[in-house]
Design a protein with these regions (language model features):
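Thiamine diphosphate
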Residues: 1-82, 93
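Flexible, low-complexity linker and terminal segments
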Residues: 64-221
């Protein structure tokens, strides 16, 4: 399934998200909640940002950087939702929604890797009957960690530029990743030069919960 709403819609649906995420998703289903974030309120009643609202209801949050990412991370979002039992949030900003690009549309180009996470007895998907406190325990102790395992196994967060002698590390996500790449181009810094002068660039696809192993590896050096 796919839910879509702008910032005010996310505000109004917080109760829905909390209950649905606690209940879970089907192992043959999955839900992607697409939030149309209009930071400058160009076509909205208020300026808004939604990541903190999804975090409050404990939904993993994906932040695609461009049109190609919308397709690729979208496929991963549904797969992660099926695997972890979580509803998965997907941040869609106005600047990207109103743009165009040439993209690869073959859905089979996205290879899904099953994590090695040890699932609890009964799995993580929706079931009935299901006590509300058991739902909360499953979400806090298993479902979010399963989402982290999925992100790690499928490299949703990537070290895009590495350097043998790193001096400066830049962590970025969403559209700001492309802004950083544009700034590099404006400065005449390609990937080879960035590595030579000691720059590391890390692109975060899942901004919450943040997968710590990849960040720790990035920060070493």
């Amino acid at each position: 399934g796919m839910w879509y709403g702008k910032g005010p819609g996310v505000d109004r649906c917080g109760d829905v998200f909390r209950h649905a995420n606690a209940a879970g998703t089907s192992k043959f289903g999955g839900v992607l909640a697409v939030a149309g974030d209009d930071h400058a309120a160009r076509s909205s009643t208020v300026a808004h940002q939604t990541e903190h609202l999804f975090k409050a209801v404990m939904m993993p949050v994906l932040a695609p950087s461009g049109v190609q990412d919308y397709l690729d991370l979208g496929m991963h979002g549904w797969a992660m939702s099926r695997y972890s039992g979580c509803w998965v949030a997907f941040k869609a900003v106005a600047d990207t929604i109103e743009s165009s690009a040439s993209v690869y549309i073959d859905p089979h180009r996205v290879n899904i890797t099953q994590p090695d996470y040890a699932l609890p007895p009964g799995g993580l998907n929706i079931r009935w009957p299901d006590d509300r406190l058991v739902q909360e325990e499953r979400l806090l102790h298993h479902k979010l960690y399963a989402a982290l395992a999925y992100a790690r196994a499928n490299r949703l967060n990537q070290l895009v530029i590495d350097s043998p002698n790193p001096r400066l590390g830049i962590i970025t996500c969403g559209k700001s990743y492309l802004d950083v790449r544009q700034a590099f181009d404006d400065l005449g810094i390609d990937d080879k030069l960035a590595a030579e002068i000691g720059i590391r660039l890390y692109k975060v696809g899942m901004v919450w919960p943040l997968e710590s192993e990849g960040v720790r590896h990035f920060a070493e050096g």
